[in-house]
């Protein structure tokens, strides 16, 4: 089985027709489903949050079979993920896609579990400490995209689980947990 870094690629990745949008509806639906799963699994395993449709992305080509996804195929597969609420287009031209391998609510739950696991109830942290502090090392929060983290924190703020406060810069933004 072919690997990309430490990620095992599925069998279909070596099947040339899967790099071309299939004309038969049932086959295309299966193709889209396989690509959605592959993109989400790969992004989660590699902690990738942004995909540029026009940029080099390891899954968009397979040199072993000399195949690459067309722009249309890339946009189709990413749009299918967007349609499931697992990604969002960051621009009207569909050039950049924010990948949500966890939905925002799930990220919010991960933050709450992180707070409980580390005894941080009624504590204050900066947003950067949540992303890259000692407590986050080895957790799913380590290196989380700032946009995703802020949306999860705002969701928790709306539920009364924390208070966000501004510092003098983005690095100083604070979080007061009240779990």
Curated annotation (Swiss-Prot):
Residues spanning the signal sequence: none
GO biological process: multivesicular body sorting pathway; protein transport
Keywords attached to this entry: Endosome, Protein transport, Transport
GO cellular component terms, A-Z: ESCRT II complex
Subcellular location: Endosome
Recorded coiled-coil stretches: none
Domain of life from the UniProt record: Eukaryota
Pfam families named among the record's database cross-references: ESCRT-II (PF05871)
Membrane-spanning intervals of the chain: none
Xref: InterPro entries: ESCRT-II_cplx_Vps25-sub, ESCRT-II_cplx_Vps25-sub_N, WH-like_DNA-bd_sf, WH_DNA-bd_sf
Sequence similarity: Belongs to the VPS25 family.
Function: Component of the ESCRT-II complex (endosomal sorting complex required for transport II), which is required for multivesicular body (MVB) formation and sorting of endosomal cargo proteins into MVBs. The ESCRT-II complex is probably involved in the recruitment of the ESCRT-III complex.
Subunit structure: Component of the ESCRT-II complex (endosomal sorting complex required for transport II), composed of VPS22, VPS25 and VPS36.
The protein's name in its UniProt record: Vacuolar protein sorting-associated protein 25
Designated gene of the protein: VPS25
């Amino acid at each position: 089985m072919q690997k990309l870094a430490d990620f095992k690629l599925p069998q279909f990745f070596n099947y040339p027709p899967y790099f071309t949008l299939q004309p038969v509806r049932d086959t295309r639906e299966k193709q889209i489903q396989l690509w959605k799963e592959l993109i989400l699994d790969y992004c989660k395993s590699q902690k990738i949050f942004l995909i540029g449709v026009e940029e080099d992305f390891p899954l968009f080509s397979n040199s072993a079979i000399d195949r690459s996804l067309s722009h249309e195929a890339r946009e189709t597969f990413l749009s299918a993920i967007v349609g499931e609420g697992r990604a969002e287009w960051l621009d009207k031209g569909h050039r950049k896609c924010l990948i949500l391998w966890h939905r925002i609510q799930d990220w919010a739950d991960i933050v709450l579990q992180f707070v409980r696991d580390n005894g941080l109830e009624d504590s204050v942290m900066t947003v950067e400490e949540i992303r890259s502090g000692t407590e986050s090392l080895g957790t799913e929060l380590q290196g989380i995209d700032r946009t995703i983290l802020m949306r999860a924190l705002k969701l928790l703020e709306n539920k009364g689980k924390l208070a966000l406060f501004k510092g003098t810069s983005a690095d100083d933004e604070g979080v007061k947990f009240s779990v």
